[in-house]
């Protein structure tokens, strides 16, 4: 039994009745607490009454704290409205709304420098509520229950800039909020035009996703347009994605419905850095350097780093060792990222590097040019691994099955 209205086992029927009784005190505060709504929370917690009740009560608190009932009338700041990519466009064959996330042109760093994380998260909450409102309207229009959405993730242009740690952490907060407060609303998620970096990016966000959500993700191959047309009618799919829908002015991307983002002009910036915690702090003596080694076992891994110095600049470069087991000078190693001086005492530095071959990579903080001052450097370095299942999926031509 699926645990949905009209397909409940006697045990599930009993659980639903008991659940309604247990949470009857909070039901009047919720927009539409019908059986469909209550079953979403039960399915999300495998019909465990205690866990389902705890989840729903936490959601009621969330709605109160974030003033969710009035969120649709709230207007996000101008920079978010103009540059946060994505949008709702059309319906799938069952009448469920379709939401597009456009990853490539998203300027994550620019958004976090121009808007507060709270406003960005609030905008995503507002999007969720607008989608639920659209489901209610579709239910009335079609005369059948619509309670889920289809998502299309356009990953063309996904790059190292999108792996910036504060951006990934902010996106993780949104995914956690979505999982905790909008359970069982995702019907399926299509990933299209995924580049080689996708398995690394997916591995970063996977911990924030429930098993159920992961099963609904379909990474599509070269035939992605054909696959989308099996789920969405051509007149409901933009020309850009293989359908026939255009804007009134003929634009094939349907830009009146989908925001395609873009680089944010610096005049919007309200800060030039995001506060970060660092895992290590070292003192680099005058006239010397400090090396940190990381073993990379296979190609495609990504090194991600952030660092800051105190009082003065510091040199930084990345090298690949040519001999194992012994410390090597910079000149004896293969230079991967050229050494240069960074004003990291003024603005913290961050970066990423895709490792094209296995070996021992050395991140070197250079103070050899300073004969007077030692440098205090705080840093965090991580090795980001690709998700193997996603990688295998992408290696299969036209992979289009849930992982």
UniProtKB/Swiss-Prot annotation:
SUPFAM superfamilies with a match to the protein in the record: CRAL/TRIO domain, CRAL/TRIO N-terminal domain, Supernatant protein factor (SPF), C-terminal domain
PTM-bearing positions, type N6-succinyllysine: 11, 51, 253, 257, 393
Keyword Nucleus: yes
Domain CRAL-TRIO, residue spans: 76-249
One of the record's GO molecular function terms: lipid binding
Localization, UniProt: Cytoplasm; Nucleus
Main localization category: cytoplasm
Source taxon at top rank: Eukaryota
Domain GOLD: 275-383
Name of the featured protein: SEC14-like protein 2
GO annotation, cellular component aspect: cytosol; nucleoplasm
